[in-house]
């Protein structure tokens, strides 16, 4: 029986699905544009990749505090419009002949900043529009949309870049307009949940809540470890493909699209796996396997590079979907609604704050190693080191399921004695 998640969630889900396809276009086009149109070095690719996450350490600490005080729906609508303007500025600058790496850095950083506020509202939006007993199914659909966008996005992006060049980014700008229209059509929700307390006190509360809870603490440590190595792999991948392996844009786009089928399957399978094994156990093993399968990229160029990239990233995405579907319900189950905004913001600040440094480290390391090893071997070494570092995230995650089981036993016991 198919669960109904309600009109408000359907609007939210629809807007996000369209916008996510546009996001994948930008994620694909920006490094491609840099490498082929701006002749960027791996270091410059790493710098702009860093900008994608720069808003996290700069704005993350206060985003949750402020969003708790604001109307979430209106906040997310405004964020969509800001991102629309920033993305549209890139092709305009290119046509005017003034697009440079620093300007691209600024535009991407603006998108990053708006996305920080949007994502805090995003995590509050789902429980605000969906009943508690349907949260996992709602997140599964959202994760399915994310992974469907990864299937369609790269091939669409490759075709659009071939036909339009920098103008392909205007498609992403248009998707933000669609998302904003969906928010406008929704009934009012997401009013301010906190009206008292200073920004500093609320911020401190968010970090305390994440660290004081034993489950949240393990999730934080696992996520920090994952994000210390994973972005190295992701940042260096287009450098490996284009400059190291000589993969063409169309072939790379096709490989990424074909690979993302695995991520779609992960989003569909995660609720069933989580129900059978437990969310915590599923998350832990998904973390380990997500990282280890990344080593498969080392099979190129011995095997055809597009095939290797497609299969590797497909498995990579399958397990990432499992992680995402399991992580959010685990965290939300440990926190009351009035503190979820600040808790999520503190979580993102702590766990995503390392991503800019990891992305910069990946690009810098390839640049430093290339003179001695060549770009192919330099990229392979850096990606392998980043992947193995991320695999250590499995260790703290192993203890999550026993804590969840204990909490459930206590809940049942308290309910039976009430």
Predicted regions and their residues:
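Alpha-helical transmembrane-bundle signature of multi-pass membrane transport and export proteins
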Residues: 1-418
């Amino acid at each position: 029986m198919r669960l109904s998640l309600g009109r408000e969630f359907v609007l939210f889900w629809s807007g996000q699905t369209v916008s996510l396809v546009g996001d994948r276009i930008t994620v694909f086009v920006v490094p491609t544009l840099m490498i082929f149109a701006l002749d960027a070095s791996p270091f410059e690719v790493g710098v702009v990749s860093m900008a994608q996450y720069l808003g996290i350490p700069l704005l993350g600490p206060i985003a949750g505090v402020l969003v708790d005080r604001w109307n979430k729906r209106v906040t997310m609508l405004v964020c969509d419009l800001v991102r629309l303007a920033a993305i549209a500025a890139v092709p305009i600058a290119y046509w005017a002949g003034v697009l440079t790496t620093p300007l691209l850095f600024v535009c991407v950083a603006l998108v990053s900043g708006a996305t920080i506020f949007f994502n805090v509202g995003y995590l509050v939006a789902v429980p605000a529009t969906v009943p508690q007993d349907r949260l996992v199914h709602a997140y599964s659909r959202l994760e399915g949309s994310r992974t469907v966008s990864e299937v369609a996005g790269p091939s669409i992006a490759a075709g659009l870049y071939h036909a339009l060049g920098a103008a392909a980014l205007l498609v992403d700008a248009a998707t933000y307009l669609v998302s904003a229209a969906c928010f406008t059509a929704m009934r009012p929700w997401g009013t301010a949940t906190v009206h008292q307390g200073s920004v500093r006190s609320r911020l401190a509360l968010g970090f305390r809540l994440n660290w004081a809870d034993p489950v949240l603490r393990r999730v934080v440590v696992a996520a920090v470890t994952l994000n210390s190595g994973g972005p190295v792999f992701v940042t260096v991948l287009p450098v490996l493909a284009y400059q190291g392996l000589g993969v063409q844009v169309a072939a790379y786009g096709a490989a990424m699209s074909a690979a993302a089928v695995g991520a779609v399957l992960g989003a569909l399978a995660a609720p069933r796996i989580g129900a059978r094994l437990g969310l915590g156990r599923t998350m832990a093993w998904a973390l380990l396997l997500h990282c280890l399968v990344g080593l498969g990229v080392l099979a190129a160029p011995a095997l055809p590079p597009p095939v290797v990239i497609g299969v590797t990233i497909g498995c990579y995405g399958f397990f990432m979907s499992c992680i995402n579907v399991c992580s959010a319900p685990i965290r939300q189950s440990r926190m009351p609604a009035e503190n979820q905004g600040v808790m999520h913001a503190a979580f993102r600040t702590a766990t995503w704050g390392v991503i800019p440094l990891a992305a910069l480290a990946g690009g810098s390391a390839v640049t430093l190693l290339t003179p001695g090893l060549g770009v192919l071997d330099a990229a392979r070494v850096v990606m392998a080191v980043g992947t193995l570092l991320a695999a250590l995230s499995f260790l703290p995650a192993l203890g999550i399921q026993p804590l969840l089981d204990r909490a459930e036993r206590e809940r049942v016991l308290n309910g039976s004695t009430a």
